[in-house]
Swiss-Prot record:
Naturally occurring in which organism (per UniProt): Burkholderia pseudomallei (strain 668)
Quaternary context: Homodimer.
A Gene Ontology term for the protein's cellular component: cytoplasm
Biological process terms in GO annotation: histidyl-tRNA aminoacylation
Enzyme Commission identifier(s): 6.1.1.21
Compartments, as annotated in UniProt: Cytoplasm
NCBIfam families linked to this entry: hisS (TIGR00442)
Gene Ontology molecular function terms on file: ATP binding; histidine-tRNA ligase activity
Record's keyword terms, sorted: Aminoacyl-tRNA synthetase, ATP-binding, Cytoplasm, Ligase, Nucleotide-binding, Protein biosynthesis
Enzyme class: ligase
A Pfam family this chain is assigned to: HGTP_anticodon
Catalytic activity: tRNA(His) + L-histidine + ATP = L-histidyl-tRNA(His) + AMP + diphosphate + H(+)
Family as reported in the entry's similarity comment: Belongs to the class-II aminoacyl-tRNA synthetase family.
Protein name (database record): Histidine--tRNA ligase
Amino acid sequence: MTEQKRKLEKLTGVKGMNDILPQDAGLWEFFEATVKSLLRAYGYQNIRTPIVEHTQLFTRGIGEVTDIVEKEMYSFVDALNGENLTLRPENTAAVVRAAIEHNMLYDGPKRLWYLGPMFRHERPQRGRYRQFHQVGVEALGFAGPDADAEIIMMCQRLWDDLGLTGIKLEINSLGLAEERAAHRVELIKYLEQHVDKLDDDAQRRLYTNPLRVLDTKNPALQEIVRNAPQLIDFLGDVSRAHFDGLQRLLKANNLPFTINPRLVRGLDYYNLTVFEWVTDKLGAQGTVAAGGRYDPLIEQLGGKPTAACGWAMGVERILELLKEEHLVPEQEGVDVYVVHQGDAAREQAFIVAERLRDTGLDVILHCSADGAGASFKSQMKRADASGAAFAVILGEDEVANGTVSVKPLRGTGAEGEKNVQQSVPVESLTEFLINAMVATAEDGDD
């Protein structure tokens, strides 16, 4: 292939890392606005961390024998200074790092939230991408089951706000470290009795992370998993009281749940409460939100021992659900499209457009695609395609008379007429348009 031909090749994005195009951006903005409103209602503050962190943050925080660290991280050596860096595969460890580094907990607990892209090197499929987006909350400095219950109830309120149904809550307790250690011994003994039936993945995890074997999706292993020792049977009094307290709070708030003793999560920092929100509408990728308590993590990353809990949810999966349930909001067009022809009209059109924007209206000013003036007919086609409610038209006659012509594109005019073009003095234009929009809205309500 010649150098010249190589330069002419069409470049494409990285597989599994998707563009968010204008026709989809409205749905993202709707979701983001809904989430931000919810989080404000619960008193959470936004935190934004870099997408690149030191690799050690994740090996220490997530765990070296987890799938994420072993197989899924985008890691590289910085050519400038030799540092080992990683594109963040999740954000809890980064938020905790920031809280420790900036001494954020010196004056008490913090409620934090984030929204942004994460990266995992895995096979792209529906609901699972190499670059994906998560929104999450971290409640730092809260030890009781009330914090667990509140962050779970936040999710339910979000589903209600979005209009989503059929998302079910599963909960479990991973207990404390000594309880997991006792369960680990018995679990390994049990799995060793069936080692010849375990698949390669389960055999690999048998001595490094046996708890994850319980989370296998392999149909051939389900009977073995069903009969395995359950961690919930190893809970001591403190863990049991915490788990019972959570259940009481959920029941008191009429939030249904299922106890799933096989729910273990894929990150090493969890203890006590873990939970997932699952649906059967997304195929194999049924988890849309997950979280729990991670009391050891802050100390593990160099801070003082501090209780904490949180959750993260995959934005792309929730947007898939919104599409699946036909809950995609209709994208609104701009208020006004300004059409003009002639040099004097073009200059006046700029002035009119800016004045309308000063009043809070959304305005598109026609700009020629080729540097030449377009006909009124072609401009009106663009005005209609833009989704604008009204076209404001300026030609030589309008400039000479100090007027504009206004044509409704989506409903009635100020006097109730449908699609009737009217001449309006420039100084009265804003008032006219506002009245016309009110009339259009009322017509739509009828």
